[in-house]
Amino acid sequence: MTQNGTLGFVMLCHTALHRAAETARHWAERGCPVVIHVDKRVRRKGYDGIVKALADLPNVRFSGRHACEWGTWGIVAATQEAATIMLQDFPQVRHVYLSSGSCLPLRPVAELVRYLDERPRTDFIESVTTEDVGWTIGGLNLERFTMRFPFSWRKQRRLFDTYVRLQRRVGLKRRVPAGIVPHLGSQWWCLTRQTLSAILDNPDRAEIDRYFRHVWIPDESYFQTLVRQVSDQVESRSLTLSKFDFQGKPHIFYDDHLQILRRSDCFVARKIWPHADRLYDSFLSNDPSGQAAAEPNPGKIDRLFARAVERRTKGRAGLYMQSRHPNENWENGRTAAAYSVFEGFSDLF
């Protein structure tokens, strides 16, 4: 096990725990402490399995378990508890990197450590105001901070939408706490010890947490908002490569994305298909020569993904596929009236 210890990883895991264990071991064996949170909804057998798989590593910890449903407070609570353990148990850690169980390192750990050591007081977190954000899908940029969301968007969609419309109609609004300027950004960040400690030890944290507990998708706004209060060296970008489709769902990387991932020069990527053996074998190998030192530049592959989204949503000239338009009004151009397409009748006409 190599020793550096200035970089620690917090991992939020809920599926494919065997892959999460591989990644955690990769980081831990190279001297980076790891604190793992496993979703409370994961069965005990799965949780016990990952604990046993990593039991031989002295720099791995497991935090208390929270139910982490998308869009709810549980993800923030899990991050808070795991980050607190990281700061308490590993005083040498200078940067804390938040990742998921489906993340995969793309470059040698030593390169990431060196990159952060050269920027010891810089916080890497996408953090933009609600007026400047351009990537949210479905609206609710500012309203997520001024409305209440007691219903699950995934499990109680009709109640969720109805309650949002009701609040708009009657003008119900929540008060944003004094000093809070809402910001949004990627959930996956890398913060300094000083910044993270200032957020977690804030004397007003109880009030702040009560407010954010009812913000929609708080994992994309809690740290992104509070970092602006305590840090003066924020680089508004994530060191984790992640891409999204036209619906806002994360792209999944497969084995045939190997060269694309290498071309990005990024340190970590998400989300990786758990059966992408070639990706895991390539990037978790002990060979440090697979990647040249370079500034992370996800823009190198942006055009490829933009073309994929365009093909998915607009197709190409002469191509109309029912499978590409599963919902009404998703067509590439609307006609004056309904029409039907008959296929397979060329022998008759």
Question: What spans do the regions from the language model cover?
Answer:
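ER/Golgi luminal nucleotide-sugar-dependent glycosyltransferases, focusing on the catalytic module
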Residues: 1-349
